Amino acid sequence: MEHVTEGSWESLPVPLHPKVLSVLRELGFPYMTPVQSATIPLFMKNKDVAAEAVTGSGKTLAFVIPIEEILLRREEKFKKSQVGAIIITPTRELAVQIEEVLSHFTKPFPQFSQILWIGGRNPGEDVARFKELGGNIIVATPGRLEDMFRRKAEGLDLASCVRSLEVLVLDEADRLLDMGFETSINTILEFLPKQRRTGLFSATQTQEVENLVRAGLRNPVRISVKEKGVAASSTQKTPSRLENHYMVCKADEKFNQLVHFLRNHKQEKHLVFFSTCACVEYYGKALETLVKGVKIMCIHGKMKYKRNKIFMEFRKLQSGILVCTDVMARGIDIPEVNWVLQYDPPSNASAFVHRCGRTARIGHGGSALVFLLPMEESYISFLAINQKCPLQEMKLQKNTADLLPKLKAMALGDRAVFEKGMKAFVSYVQAYAKHECNLIFRLKDLDFASLARGFALLRMPKMPELRGKQFPDFVPVDVNTDTIPFKDKIREKQRQKQLLEQQRKEKTENDGRRKFIKNKAWSKQKAKKEKKKKLTEKRKREEGSDVEDEDMEELLNDTRLLKKFKKGKITEEEFEKGLLTSGKRSTNKADLEISDLEDDC
């Protein structure tokens, strides 16, 4: 394990290019952070590095600067289509951020070109841009980069372009694996030359990360950077200048407490984390209405094309609120975030650390607050032990305004709000059921009535988790929710059209059902007629056909004899004798009838 020091950039054992030093001064970074002073010299001496450091410790510059220096020291100049470095990162937002930082360092060196490959963009346009402008340094998300390696239709042969690769960086490696990119990473590694320098950067060390180190790095130097002033025996994973708080309140008090807090901190910059995309959509809309005089924006993983624009816009704000999911929890560097508010605790403990790390970055101060239900209070000690992350209690604010009736009124006035509330509640319950810390976050202990009031629901939704449960403490509104219209006239017109189509469909089905019932009655009438016809024929036979009657009698006698024989009541000899007697009787009768007929003639 390397000894970690820090100092000025000029104190590095391998000198940096004067233009690189100039950019560092312009950006306001006169000194290195511990992870930078530990990593940069090793990277520049052709070592593979696996660096673990707390979030917000300056890991981005720890690989951007070595990339720049390594490419500058290459004797042969790069052609525009030759790739010298690849940086892989788990999310679009982080990729955009890294590409922005990188652009400061490539600007003084026009011989280098860089390109950003992320989802949410047209891949054909990415290929065209690469062929036109080149990309000596690629910043990409795993899925898009894998797609580019496999893409042949547009005439791109990326496998040939990466033969000149000098450096590969895997940023937020633990998150890359958590998000299911392991297969994509392994596919990408197969295309890359073995003779390269590889850097793996992570805030947490897991077994999966260790496996990736063994697969992708050659004799790596392992670097673990602790917070200054933290005891060696400790493994604190949050910045030392971060103040961590918690507030215990009931589910139907949380929203009022959140709004009260935001109204009292309008001049500051906040990230508000929710557990699901649906919760972001619902509460983001509610906060826009109830917290006036402050810019409120929403971002989550299901946004395909708006995310980058929203992210870049929020970064530029001096104050504002970004309502988000964990898509914003890792590696994202948003300038001067004052508070990280966790309305819902994250699904795992490591995500808690990463959420908090969006503030108090690179030596700046910052604060974080997590809202907990009374049944979740043991999570505080769990974080202190598991993540070495102590929390201080923040008392409930008294005399807060009750905003839930206003939220209900919003739902009654606009079907969009009503539907978003229902979806948010369902998604929250489903996410809660899958919580990693299920000994603390137990679904069976959840107060669903209080939770539904906290979501300002008009009625309880139908879902498997609530089947068979009674909620005497929850009073649904005395309104037929099917009649609630959309405020958007176009959406309401579409809804009414769908309702009419549904009514026509139901009418058609009902008519078909009635027709089936009528057909069934007709069948009964037909059967009745058949029965009547048979009775008539029988009567006619009895009246006009003595021969047929005798034949029937003979058949019945033969049947009776056969039954007696099978049951053992008569012998075989008696059975045959009976048959002969029956036949003679019929013959005599027939002969008599024929003679009578001849006499009549």
UniProtKB/Swiss-Prot annotation:
Entries under Pfam families matching the protein: CTE_SPB4, DEAD, Helicase_C
Gene Ontology cellular-component terms for this entry are:
nucleolus
Query: Which residues of the sequence carry a binding annotation for ATP?
Result: A53, V54, T55, G56, S57, G58, K59, T60
Which ranges carry the Helicase ATP-binding domain?
40-223
Q: Where is this motif: DEAD box?
A: 171-174
The set of disulfide-linked cysteines is: none
According to the UniProt entry, where does the motif Q motif sit in this chain?
A: 9-37
EC number(s) stated in the UniProt entry for this protein: 3.6.4.13
Positions carrying Phosphoserine? S545, S595
Instruction: Give start-end positions of Basic and acidic residues composition bias.
Output: 502-514
Catalysed reactions listed for this entry: ATP + H2O = ADP + phosphate + H(+)
Q: What keyword terms does UniProt attach to this protein?
A: ATP-binding, Helicase, Hydrolase, Nucleotide-binding, Nucleus, Phosphoprotein, Ribosome biogenesis, RNA-binding, rRNA processing, rRNA-binding
- PROSITE patterns registered for this protein in UniProt: DEAD_ATP_HELICASE (PS00039), HELICASE_ATP_BIND_1 (PS51192), HELICASE_CTER (PS51194), Q_MOTIF (PS51195)
Q: Which domain of life is it from?
A: Eukaryota
Region annotation (Disordered) maps to 502-553, 576-601
- UniProt biased composition (Basic residues): 515-538
Mind telling me which SMART domains this protein's record contains? Answer: DEXDc, DUF4217, HELICc
Tell me one GO molecular function of this protein.
Answer: ATP binding
- Xref: CDD domains: DEADc_DDX55, SF2_C_DEAD
Query: What is known about what this protein does?
Result: Probable ATP-binding RNA helicase. Has ATPase activity and is involved in the maturation of precursor large subunit rRNAs.
Which family is it part of? Belongs to the DEAD box helicase family. DDX55/SPB4 subfamily.
User: Domain comment text?
Assistant: The Q motif is unique to and characteristic of the DEAD box family of RNA helicases and controls ATP binding and hydrolysis. The C-terminal region is required for DDX55 nuclear import and association with pre-ribosomal complexes.
Q: What is this protein called?
A: ATP-dependent RNA helicase DDX55
